[in-house]
Amino acid sequence: MVRIFLCLLKWQFSVLFFFFGVFPMLGQDLEPRAYANVPKGLNVIAAGYVFMNGNVLTDPSLPIKDFTLQSHNMAVNYIKTFGLADKLARIQVGLPFTFMDGSAVISDQLVTGSRTGFADMKVRFGINLLGSPALDKSEFRSFEQKTILGVSLVTSIPTGRYYGDKQVNIGTNRWAFKPEIGVSKRFAHVYAEAYGGVWFYTNNNDYLGKKLEQKPTCSLQAHASYYFKNQMWVGFNTTWFFGGRTIADGVSDESQIDNWRVGGTFSTPIAKGQSVRFQYHIGAYTNNGLNYYALSAVYQYSFF
């Protein structure tokens, strides 16, 4: 009986690590200013750290207690802006590295596990279709943003560490794609933003000797950011993601993701072309799976 419960625990570990690999570039789909208007020819290099800690909601009928997960995540990102058909476009590449630990008490036995390695690389291509022309640095100084409409495609590339014979993995061993549409509206010092996207996944054909499929996951975000004269800004962030039912060798898991998160962001310049950003977010509602909080710190260097 204990062996069965251990298998169930390992399966839940796999699902949780699986979603850790899908959603974050630096955090879980809380990305304010993703469609911000900036000059073309801008290069941005960022290095960040994210700490995540939380508990796992399990079936009450299972003898599982104190199921917790903790991870330390580091990532580097590069962003390049350019003109495309006189519209502002950008490409972003992010590569995370993760240290994860988990533990649970099953039938009065302590079970622990850990993983270390690269997670899946993310590449984002976006273009602002309306309200954001491709301007050089001198032209940009006199431009005033009103309403921006943009689209993007995020691609998750299976570069993460993965073992086909283990339930706990950092990598996902499959590709994922998220087309997204976003709107950004300026109200004096306040920038209001809303994004909507859907994650689509290819199959993982090496999941413990089985084929693992996942239905699309919908993602909605909303952000409100207040800018000060020195380009320091603070923001309120929220996201809702739902769907994502999994199927292993044709057998469906009826549980789906239905999670709502809220958080805040603070960014301030520290020198010419340099800034630091801090973000905190927490689960406001979680129907199943991992209910966690995350704290991140990012250093950013911009140049032309």
Kindly give the residue locations of the regions a language model identified.
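Hydrophobic, lipid-facing positions within transmembrane beta-strands of outer-membrane proteins
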Residues: 43-45, 72-76, 119-123, 149, ...
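Transmembrane beta-barrel strands of outer-membrane/channel proteins
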Residues: 45-51, 91-99, 149-157, 194-200, ...
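Residue-level signature of outer-membrane beta-barrel architecture
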Residues: 49, 80-82, 127-129, 155, ...
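Surface-exposed strand-loop-strand hairpins of Gram-negative outer-membrane beta-barrel proteins
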Residues: 52-73, 111, 164-168
